[in-house]
Amino acid sequence: MIDENNLHGILKKVMIMKKKCALYASKLVKDGMVVGLGGGSTISYLIDYVKDKDIKVVSPSSKTVLLAQKMGLTVLNTQYVDHVDIAFDGCDEVDSHLNALKSGGIHTQEKIIASMADEYIVLVDESKFHETLTFKVPVVVEVLPKAYSVVKKKLEKLNGNVELRTASNKDGFLMSDEGNILLDVYFDGVQDIRLLNQTLLMMPGVVDTSLFVDILTGMILVNDKGVFKKERNGEFYAL
């Protein structure tokens, strides 16, 4: 039987930690900046902290766009932006080398924004940080529809357990905003993250993957002891 009081306490603790992480991230946002904002609850808290700043926002997340507009922020269409001062995002896992794994399915758009950003920082609590990625969530592979069968076969040859992502609110499979198929691929015992990502990207018909390798410039991590930042090739330091 679930202890509701204990569950409520855990959820409240997580919320407080996420708000603290967002608060420290907001201190990096200055007037005049173009800011990239991903998706998730921590980003929602960040929007609340920066809503009164003179900034412009780009986002791959429709929910984030709607919330930012509701809060009075100017949202730009990514199509017309070629530079972002700083971008923040969440992830399912991040490791000590700043490799990250996401499962939201909007990774191609997230990477476009990351490529424009001077800084691309993930905001996480300690449950998301691992010395190396665990791959407990799937690698999402975005595939051109006509390449579905051949890519699926190649993924299975790599010992990937492939699932066609389906829509929870309608019959049929789920497609990306660009009209491509999303495959959830579960891998066990990944030894070389970089090699896996390169192998996937080299498959004809693969648009991109939800593995973020050599993309993050930093992470802000919150735990019971405080808020810490880590930059590429650096150690954690307290904020």
Locations of regions flagged by a protein language model:
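Conserved phosphate- and dinucleotide-binding cores of soluble alpha/beta proteins
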Residues: I2-G9, K63-L66, M71-L239
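N-terminal active-site beta-alpha-beta segment that forms phosphate/nucleotide-binding
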Residues: I2, N6-D89
